[in-house]
A protein has these predicted regions:
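Active-site glycine-centered loops adjacent to acidic/histidine catalytic or metal-binding residues
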Residues: 114, 140, 313
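A charged helix-plus-loop insertion that forms the helical arch/lid used to bind
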Residues: 83-93
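ATP-binding/phosphotransfer module of carbohydrate and carboxylate kinases, centering on a glycine-rich
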Residues: 1-68, 78-80, 98-107, 121-131, ...
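Short beta-strand scaffold segments in enzyme catalytic cores
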Residues: 22-26, 75-76, 143-148
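Short hydrophobic alpha-helix segments
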Residues: 37-39, 87, 157
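General beta-strand structural signal in soluble alpha/beta enzymes
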Residues: 109-113
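A short acidic/small-residue loop/turn micro-motif
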Residues: 40-43, 91, 161-163
């Protein structure tokens, strides 16, 4: 008698919820995205839940067997799936996102911090796969983080761990978007690189970068700096090297505390490849304690790119047992 073939696990939907955009995808057990949609939300985030519910509904039209939905949301997400605070989404203040979205779509929903979701995606399907202890750092408009130890995302007592962009490295430094001065995010985010580019251009130190912005100092962004550095222009390279030092300051501090075996860097700046990562690795080696006497900590680019959050959130949803509420306990 031949045993019946085991039915494939139903797909899940992963949602990456940002300040002004929502992206969702149907993801199978292998981490492949079968369908993907995105939509815009209002600046204040008041329409995030109905917009997300509508997007999930459109995805389910072609994939009615979807079993659950995972959401990676910006901000402080607690164990109940409530977003307590999101600095870039004014409407997210003590918002019961898991409950309200679940009621709107009629499926089990699990909600996690967006950086944690991306970290989980890289652990399960990406560049951190096989690492027992890993640190995920996202260099975007801000800086996000995820910590993995022995195959589990570390969330802390309240779910707010790994807000790595918000440790202070200079109390007299530039103002962070959260309203406090001198946070690592204010020095080493993608927005910070753009600010550095404008400062250098205004001081006459970055003519190549300025030319790429059409000669308009206020138009200079991190993209112009990266293009200049990749083009071999001395000013772009020097500026990016200084930025790499600031990235390494934070990475070395985190590594001294957490002792990961691998650090995965994600975000748009990773597209610069070794133009950015080589000076980051060199500066990191100079700054971490006992560099010559400790095992090497690999610093690698993320493998999943901007899809890490969707894939990781879907993987979190796949871990839900039938009938489980979506409140995470590990």
């Amino acid at each position: 008698m031949t045993e019946a073939a085991e039915e494939p696990a139903p797909p899940t939907i992963g949602v990456d919820l940002g300040a002004t955009n929502v992206r969702g995808g149907v993801v199978d057990r292998s981490g492949s995205i079968l369908a993907e949609l995105r939509d815009h939300t209002g600046d204040d985030g008041a329409d995030v839940i109905p917009t997300t519910a509508a997007l999930v509904g459109r995805l389910r039209t072609d994939f009615p067997a979807v079993a659950a939905v995972g959401v990676g949301a910006a901000g402080l997400v607690d164990r109940d799936g409530d977003v307590q605070y999101a600095p870039n989404i004014p409407a997210f203040r003590r918002t019961p996102l898991r409950e309200e979205l679940g009621n709107a779509i009629g499926l089990p929903v699990v909600v996690d911090n967006d950086a944690n979701a991306a970290a989980w995606g890289e652990i399960v399907h990406g560049a951190a796969r096989g690492a027992l202890y890993a640190l995920m750092v996202t260099l975007g408009s801000g800086i996000g983080g995820g910590i993995v130890a022995r195959g589990r995302v570390i969330r802390g007592a309240h779910g707010f761990a790994a807000e790595v962009g918000h440790f202070q490295i200079d109390p007299n430094g530039p103002m962070c978007a959260c309203g406090e001065p001198g946070h690592w995010e204010a020095f080493a985010s993608g927005h910070a690189l753009g600010r550095m580019g404008r400062e250098w251009a205004a001081a006459g130190r970055a003519p190549g970068v300025l030319a790429r912005a059409g000669g308009d100092v206020e138009a200079v962004t991190g993209v112009h700096v990266g293009d200049s550095a990749q083009g071999g222009e001395a000013d772009g390279r020097a500026l990016l090297d200084e930025y790499a030092e600031l990235v390494a300051v934070g990475l070395a501090g985190l590594a001294n505390i957490l002792d990961p075996e691998r650090i995965v860097i994600s975000g748009g700046l990773v597209e610069l490849g070794d133009t950015l990562l080589a000076p980051v690795r060199a500066a990191f080696a100079r700054r971490i304690e006992g560099s010559a006497y400790r095992p090497r900590i690999d610093i690698v680019p993320a493998a999943l790119g901007e899809q890490a959050g969707v894939i990781g959130a879907a993987a979190r949803a796949r871990d839900l047992e039938p009938g489980e509420s979506g409140v995470w306990t590990k």
